[in-house]
Swiss-Prot record:
Pfam family, one: Phage_int_SAM_1
Any Gene Ontology CC annotation: cytoplasm
Gene3D superfamilies in UniProt: 1.10.150.130, Intergrase catalytic core
Entry keyword set: Cell cycle, Cell division, Chromosome partition, Cytoplasm, DNA integration, DNA recombination, DNA-binding
Species for this entry: Mycobacterium tuberculosis (strain ATCC 25618 / H37Rv)
Subunit structure: Forms a cyclic heterotetrameric complex composed of two molecules of XerC and two molecules of XerD. Co-immunoprecipitates with DarG in the presence and absence of darT.
Record: active site: R160, K184, H256, R259, H282, Y291
Protein name according to UniProt: Tyrosine recombinase XerD
Any one GO biological process: resolution of DNA recombination intermediates
């Protein structure tokens, strides 16, 4: 194995063993660093000790530009900034371990992303989406019951899709109407669950899950696929897409849009931004405050259309 490949693997091992980085995050780092490794090798660099600050800066430029010849798409500012985080971590590790004399990525600044407001659904659209999933008839099968429970839980708790499909049976208490979510970095938070979501979960756990569980090997996962294994993020995404299509919602709907809707509707209902921060599992209230801009934007539109001196 080449020196550069060994150095990259050493950093990934460090993230796994010593830092306990989540599997999804590790997968993203591996993908970004593979791209960085290719960038360096194309310049004849096979050792981190030979990398200069300009090599890192040029990598960032290449990410934003893309490469039509190789079919590599240009990355957004957000995606490029994420890739730079992985590269910075690599060079910080290299300097600390004596693999390189200096941390050459330290001074490279990430691109500034445009401040786009997160898209959310209206309350009526969410209700149509949930009803489109079915699960409210005695004749509904186990997969329909599961689909309704997944969507109700996502909207009721604001959970990330990975948090929802990662739930085990011990993580939810339908009597106390609460669920234990495991977020980024292994951080846990106890979140209340609304009554409609509890009803959907009870229906699935009693009438749906046992049938699915008999097809599998005894996993503790709450949400099971048709073969009795843990439901994947991709399959949960498809559940949402199918429900949106049945509800006649033409705009692209993603699991994160339900999370955005959860936060926006809470703030519109008068919830304190720091409470929403805790419910979402954000490390900083600054991340949550983007949703306050959504509600202010909606108020501004109403004001502009109704106030005689708005124009």
């Amino acid at each position: 194995m080449k020196t550069l490949a060994l150095q990259l693997q050493g950093y990934l091992d460090h993230l796994t063993i010593e830092r306990g980085v989540a599997a999804n995050t590790l997968s993203s780092y591996r993908r970004d660093l593979r791209r960085y490794s290719k960038h360096l090798e194309e310049r004849g660099i096979t050792d981190l000790a030979k990398v200069g600050e300009h090599d890192v800066s040029e990598f960032l430029v290449a990410l934003r530009r893309g490469d039509p010849d190789s079919g590599t798409a240009a990355l957004s500012a957000v995606s490029a900034a994420r890739a730079l985080i992985a590269v910075r971590g690599l060079h910080r590790f290299a300097a600390a371990e004596g693999l390189a004399e200096l941390d050459v990525a330290r001074a490279v600044r990430p691109p500034t992303p445009s401040r786009r407001l997160p898209k959310s659904l209206t309350i009526d659209e969410v209700l149509s989406l949930l009803e489109g999933a079915g699960g409210d008839k005695p004749s509904d099968g186990p997969l329909t019951l599961r689909n309704r429970a997944v969507l109700e839980l996502l909207y009721s708790t604001g959970a990330r899709i990975s948090e929802a499909v990662g739930l085990d049976l011990d993580d939810i208490d339908t009597h106390a109407r609460s669920v234990l979510l495991r977020g980024k970095g292994g951080k846990q938070r106890l979140v209340p669950v609304g009554r409609p979501a509890v009803h959907a979960l009870d229906a699935y756990l009693v009438r749906g899950r046992p049938d699915l569980a008999r097809r599998g090997r005894g996993t503790a996962a709450i949400f099971l696929n048709a073969r009795g294994g843990r439901l994947s993020r991709q399959s949960a995404w498809q559940v949402l897409q199918d429900a949106a299509e049945r509800a006649g919602i033409t705009a692209g709907v993603s699991p994160h849009m339900l999370r955005h809707s959860f936060a926006t509707h809470l703030l519109e209902g008068g919830a304190d931004v720091r409470v929403v921060q805790e419910l979402l599992g954000h490390a900083s209230v600054t991340t949550t405050q983007i949703y306050t801009l959504v509600t202010v934007h909606a108020l501004r539109e109403v004001w502009a259309g109704a106030h005689p001196r708005a124009r």
